[in-house]
Structure formats: structure tokens, C-alpha cells
Curated annotation (Swiss-Prot):
This is Uncharacterized protein K421R. Induction: Expressed in the late phase of the viral replicative cycle. Keywords: Late protein, Virion. GO terms for cellular component: virion component. It is found in: Virion. Belongs to the asfivirus K421R family.
Length: 421
């Protein structure tokens, strides 16, 4: 009877029309939010940034603020005053984490999530490279995270089963954002990489690298082992990228002990990559230091502590050098972009010319994403045994942060009165 009637299509079209009509009621609310973001130079993040890039309408704004407590109160007041007798009468400001995360609801709908810019130490904020996009609603140039940071956010969620319901949408965002990102780097450079001097010590460097991947607590995400995975060889590229599930300082002691017992001369440094979307991230860097000469030091390993606070999906590969755990393609892409972000930050802060090495990683990233895709199971492992690391319940993390900040002084920054002590 209904074989010639597109019932589902008609229902979808009717529902979409109703939803759009309902959303149009809040046009003044959305415009006020965007004007506030523009005036206070806030930085849009998350899905809001993806939609901004793609020139689509935004109905939930997520953004960073350099004065999140005051800005949240000011914006909530503005929204309430729009129509206090009707639409915006029930404007609610919710404190998720004091001085760090606030939510604004209007008419029982969530419209705003405000975050403090993560701090490096004390109250020094992590630097965020400026990037502008034109809004589809107000046509203003708004600050937002750059495409490399947005892709890192997307890949992080594509590796996390907690976001499985969002994966189809995220895959669409990933494809669009990747194209926009690569458009910034139109030139492809052929870079040999490495130094001839490194070849003299290749056997020693290889010994260190193979020790790094011999334990099941570490995951390969790029560098040396990659030449066994794809149809290209990275010439003299001995550098290895790893993720560890151990504490980064515990790893430092383990590695130093191994190298000392084998007479291998290395230097180890731990630093903060200053990733605003992932402030917990730390990087341990190992340099092979021949003859204790800093001019003869070669960077051979970058190790990230991601597995100490989240689960990482893995695949197992077999090579001539042995069997290793390697991150899924989305994990590898994520950490190639972390390297690119760090190099862009160095170039911006020190004025050093990092174009060639950035292009090297861009080429790696492009080859990775253009390689034949493995099976769905290799992209999205369904077995819990294929995930390595430590799971931290996000709700427990919020409660821990709330407890930690419970006794925060009422004034910012809080300092005791020396005369009254």
C-alpha cells in the first residue's frame, strides 16, 4: 500500500523543518553569544570550531577564555536581559569546576561551555597560535583553534570508545578538516632526514630503540618502525615515537638504568608540548650522546605519557626486528600532528625556520592517511585486550578537580595578606 510513498524521507524532512523552526527562536541568543566571543577575543574549540571552519551553524558554543569566571557571569547576565519575561527568563549559570569550567543554559537548553585556558605553571597560560574563521551567523572573524589542534581533538575521540556514537560525524569532520589542513602546505619537499654521522652509530642507536619497544607497556606511534609498515622508506630516520602506560618519570629511571648498565651514553629530557587541548601530555626525549659532546647528540626517541591517563587502541605487527604493539592509524596521525604543533610553536616563539622539518612530518602524515586503510577491526578494535593504558573515569576526574579547588581563595589570584599573618 505504501510501497510508492517515501514515508521515511517525508518524516525526516518534516522533522528537520520543525527543528530548524524551533532553533530560529533562539537567534538573538546565538547572536549575543557570538558578539561576546568576538568582543572578548575568546577562542572557539571542540565541535563548535569544526562547524565554524565548515561555515555551518553552531547551536552549542565551546570556547576558551582568559578570565573564565568573570566572562561566564557577564555572558549569563547579557543572555538573561535579552528577554527576561519570556525566552531567557530561565538563564542558568552552572559551575562545573570553579575557575576552570562553566556551563550556561537558556530555557533549559545548553548553549555555552566556557573553559579556562590551561596553565603551564602557576597562572601562566598555554600559548595558542591565533587562527581566524568567518562566522556563518554574524560574519565576524572569530578566534578558534587551528586545524592541526582540531584534528588532534578529532583523532583523540576516534580512539576513545566513550565517543562511539559520535564516530560517524567525527569521520566526516576529519575528512573536511584534513583537506583544509593540507591546503596550508601545498608544496611537497623531498627530505632525506638524519645525518651521515648517525650512520656510524646506527647499531648502537638501533639497540636502544629495540629495547624501547621490547616491553608491552609501550606502543609505537611513528618513526623508525614505520618503514616496515608502508611502501616507503624514511632514509636515515632513526627517531622513534612511543606511548607509555607508565608514569613518565618512572620511565626515565628505567631507561637510564638500562643505558648505564650497557655503557650507552644518553641524555634524557622531559618537557611539556604545551598542547591546549591536552594539558596532561608530557614528552620524554632521549638523545644519543657520543663522547659526551653536545654537538654530536642525536635525538632518537620521543616518548609520550598518554597511556598513563587514557586507553590507547593498538595493533600488533611482526617485522624482521621482532613483534611490536603499534597504535592504530588514528593514533599515529594524532602524534604526527603533535610533532607538527610543537614545531609550529617553536617557529612562532623563537623565529626559527622549521619549515623543512614541518614539511617532513606533513609528508609522513599525508602518506599515512593516503595508504590503503586496514580492516575496520584494525581501525576500531572491539576487544578490550587491544587497548593499552589506564582508564580514568571523566566524572571522577571532575569530582577530583572540584575537591582539589574547594578551598580556593575567593579572590584571583589569591595571596595572603602579609600584614595580617
Amino acid at each position: 500500500m505504501y510501497t510508492h510513498v517515501d514515508v521515511v524521507g517525508i518524516a525526516e524532512a518534516s522533522a528537520a523543518l520543525y527543528v530548524q523552526k524551533d532553533r530560529d527562536r533562539y537567534l538573538d541568543v546565538l547572536t549575543t553569544i557570538e558578539n561576546f566571543i568576538y568582543q572578548h577575543k575568546c577562542i572557539i574549540t571542540g565541535e563548535s570550531a569544526h562547524l565554524l571552519f565548515l561555515k555551518k551553524n553552531i547551536y552549542l558554543y565551546e570556547f576558551y577564555s582568559n578570565n573564565v569566571a568573570e566572562h561566564s557571569k557577564a555572558l549569563a547576565t547579557l543572555l538573561y536581559k535579552l528577554d527576561p519575561e519570556y525566552l531567557t527568563r530561565y538563564t542558568v549559570l552552572i559551575t562545573k569546576i570553579p575557575n576552570h569550567w562553566y556551563v550556561i543554559n537558556v530555557d533549559q537548553r545548553e548553549f555555552v561551555r566556557l573553559y579556562a585556558i590551561p596553565a603551564v605553571k602557576q597562572h601562566l597560560p598555554i600559548p595558542i597560535l591565533p587562527f581566524y574563521c568567518t562566522s556563518a551567523l554574524t560574519h565576524q572573524e572569530l578566534f578558534c583553534l587551528g586545524p592541526e589542534l582540531q584534528l588532534i581533538q578529532i583523532y583523540s575521540k576516534l580512539c576513545n570508545p566513550n565517543f562511539v556514537e559520535e564516530w560517524p560525524t567525527l569521520l566526516d569532520y576529519e575528512k573536511s578538516m584534513r583537506m583544509l589542513f593540507l591546503e596550508q602546505f601545498p608544496r611537497r619537499l623531498e627530505i632525506a632526514g638524519g645525518k651521515k654521522e648517525e650512520e656510524k652509530h646506527e647499531s648502537i642507536i638501533k639497540k636502544i630503540i629495540l629495547e624501547m619497544v621490547s616491553t608491552r607497556q609501550r606502543i609505537v606511534v611513528g618513526g623508525y618502525i614505520q618503514k616496515n609498515l608502508y611502501n616507503h622508506v624514511l632514509k636515515n630516520r632513526n627517531r622513534l615515537q612511543l606511548i607509555t602506560s607508565l608514569d613518565i618519570y618512572e620511565e626515565k629511571d628505567i631507561i637510564q638504568q638500562f643505558c648505564d648498565s650497557n655503557g650507552l651514553k644518553i641524555k634524557i629530557r622531559i618537557n611539556n608540548p604545551l598542547l591546549p587541548t591536552n594539558p596532561e601530555l608530557r614528552r620524554l626525549t632521549i638523545y644519543f650522546n657520543h663522547n659526551n659532546d653536545d654537538d654530536q647528540s642525536y635525538l632518537i626517541v620521543d616518548m609520550y605519557n598518554t597511556g598513563s591517563y587514557e586507553l590507547v587502541p593498538t595493533n600488533q605487527i611482526n617485522t624482521l626486528d621482532g613483534s611490536f604493539l603499534i597504535g592504530t592509524p588514528f593514533v599515529q596521525a594524532r602524534f604526527l600532528l603533535v610533532e607538527i604543533w610543537v614545531l609550529m610553536l617553536i617557529a612562532q616563539q623563537t623565529k626559527k625556520d622549521t619549515k623543512k622539518i614541518i614539511q617532513f612530518f606533513i609528508n609522513q602524515y599525508e602518506m599515512l592517511m593516503n595508504s590503503p586503510w586496514p580492516s575496520m577491526e584494525a581501525l576500531f578494535p572491539s576487544s578490550s585486550k587491544r587497548y593499552l593504558g589506564n582508564y580514568v573515569d571523566p566524572n571522577a576526574l571532575i569530582k577530583w578537580a572540584q575537591l582539589k579547588l574547594k578551598r580556593i581563595p575567593p579572590f584571583y589570584p589569591g595571596k595572603p595578606d602579609e600584614e595580617s599573618c
